[in-house]
């Protein structure tokens, strides 16, 4: 009988599964098991909680990396513990089996195709392609040390206590800290008592951390407890701070001292490229302290929903670390009563690199717009511009469009419906809005065919939210 090309992998698969049914047989034959059988059999053993088989397969793992995170999304704490027990046996005895190549236990929550590639290879018999298609692994600089094993993990601290997997892992790591290296590249703090956060940060090599997000309504006294840890994150590339408030019990002198302690930590962050600050109240009148401590050229700067003084904007425009920005987001910063000359200077500085500009809800009025138009029209790399929530007239909007029309890379533009679209009570006049929109679109089409232009209206009669309308007057988002 002629066998199809699918027969060999199918036979291998059946033979491998038989090993899981006979634990003793698995113990004696793992050293000779074909490499291509390890991933599909490991998945099978994990889902079926074949703990003894898992321990043995980990000890004979023929790949450099074991990406476990996609598998522990299944409720299998027992299987997870078995994997760590298998590693434990190797770490403590110090003698590794002949086939063992494992250097990285990867628990990062990333898009992972390792298991998918090998499963498809099992079905198709294309094991050579599976080897070629393996995703490259980003190493940790500290992996060159003495520890034989590195554990990659992402920390999401969002509840009062950790989930059972992370709790078990951290306890396991703590007891074996001399035998392995725990590497955390992403730290997200969304809500947890700081005493718990502190105990976790003490276990992590802070100089491995590359991204930090803090979004849990801290007041300044709590921020002071986090500040010393931030200064040790010397490879930090991205920092997100959200909902930082000034306690009413903090005096102006104390506030200045705390802000100084915090901002001076930026002197140590020589890899920082992306800085996001949303609803950070202590920036008011103190932005210069932070900017003067930046030691790198930022690619992304977002300061949103904050209160800034006019002097803060002036310091921002003079900061040498913003001259290579690709993203600038100042949405939600009220600029109504300020001169926009600092913003003009800022746009002139970043004109050669800026790709995304968001000035939503800044309260910019007609008399202010002219100040930024010459600089805006020179941002030739700009591909997205949003200007919603600024109460401007039809004439000002036409003037704005005439300056952005020459930006050939501009793909997405979002503008407010002009004031003439609304009645005296602030409600939208649909017929008038449709007429204005048609006039504007005809003018734009005469000069340049836009890729995507949206007009924004506030307080949609249907949902009460902000709505967007495109060229064809179809509602895009409501």
From Swiss-Prot:
InterPro entries: LRR_dom_sf, PRAME, PRAME_domain
LRR repeats mapped onto the chain: 17-40, 99-126, 181-205, 206-232, 233-268, 269-294, 295-326, 327-348, 351-378, 379-403
Keywords, ordered alphabetically: Leucine-rich repeat, Repeat
Gene3D superfamilies with a match to the protein in the record: Ribonuclease Inhibitor (3.80.10.10)
TM regions (residue ranges): none
GO biological process terms held by the UniProt record: negative regulation of apoptotic process; negative regulation of cell differentiation; negative regulation of DNA-templated transcription; positive regulation of cell population proliferation; proteasome-mediated ubiquitin-dependent protein catabolic process
Protein family membership: Belongs to the PRAME family.
UniProt name for this protein: PRAME family member 27
Native species: Homo sapiens
Gene that encodes the chain: PRAMEF27
């Amino acid at each position: 009988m002629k066998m199809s090309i699918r027969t060999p992998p199918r036979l291998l698969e059946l033979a491998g599964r038989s090993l899981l049914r006979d634990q003793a047989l698995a113990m004696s034959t793992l050293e000779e098991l074909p490499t291509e059988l390890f991933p599909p059999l490991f998945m099978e053993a994990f889902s079926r909680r074949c703990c003894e088989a898992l321990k043995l397969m980990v000890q004979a793992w023929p790949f450099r990396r074991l990406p476990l995170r996609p598998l522990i999304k299944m409720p299998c704490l027992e299987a997870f513990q078995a994997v760590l027990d298998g590693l434990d046996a190797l770490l403590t005895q110090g003698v590794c089996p002949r086939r063992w190549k494992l250097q990285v236990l990867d628990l990062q929550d990333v898009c992972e195709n390792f298991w998918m590639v090998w499963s498809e290879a099992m079905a198709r018999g294309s094991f050579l392609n599976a080897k070629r298609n393996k995703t490259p692994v980003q190493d940790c600089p500290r992996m060159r040390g003495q520890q034989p094993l590195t554990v990659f993990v992402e920390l999401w601290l969002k509840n009062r206590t950790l989930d059972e997997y992370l709790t078990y892992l951290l306890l396991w790591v703590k007891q074996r800290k001399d035998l392995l290296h725990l590497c955390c590249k992403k730290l997200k703090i969304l809500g947890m008592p700081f005493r718990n956060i502190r105990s976790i940060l003490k276990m992590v090599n802070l100089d491995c951390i590359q991204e930090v997000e803090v979004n849990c309504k801290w007041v300044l006294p709590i921020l002071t407890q986090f500040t010393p840890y931030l200064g040790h994150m010397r490879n930090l590339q991205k920092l997100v701070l959200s909902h930082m408030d000034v306690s009413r019990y903090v005096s102006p002198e104390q506030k200045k001292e705390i802000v100084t302690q915090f901002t001076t930590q930026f002197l140590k962050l020589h890899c920082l490229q992306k800085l996001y600050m949303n609803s950070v109240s202590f920036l008011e009148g103190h932005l210069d302290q932070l900017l003067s401590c930046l030691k790198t050229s930022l690619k992304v700067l977002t300061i949103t929903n904050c209160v800034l003084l006019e002097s803060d904007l002036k310091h921002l425009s003079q900061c040498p670390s913003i001259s290579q920005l690709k993203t600038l987001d100042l949405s939600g910063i009220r600029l109504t009563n300020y001169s926009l000359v600092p913003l003009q200077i800022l746009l002139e500085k970043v004109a050669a690199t800026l790709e995304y500009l968001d000035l939503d809800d800044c309260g910019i009025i007609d008399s202010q717009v002219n100040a930024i138009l010459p600089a805006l029209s020179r941002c030739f790399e700009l591909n997205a511009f949003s200007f919603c929530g600024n109460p401007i007239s039809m004439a000002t909007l036409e003037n704005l469009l005439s300056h952005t029309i020459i930006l050939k890379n501009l793909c997405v533009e979002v503008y407010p419906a002009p004031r003439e679209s609304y009645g005296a009570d602030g409600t939208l006049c649909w017929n008038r809005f449709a007429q204005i929109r048609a006039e504007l679109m005809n003018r734009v089409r005469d000069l340049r065919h836009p890729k995507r232009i949206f007009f924004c209206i506030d307080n949609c009669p249907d949902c009460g939210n902000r709505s967007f309308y495109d060229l064809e007057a179809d509602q895009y988002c409501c």
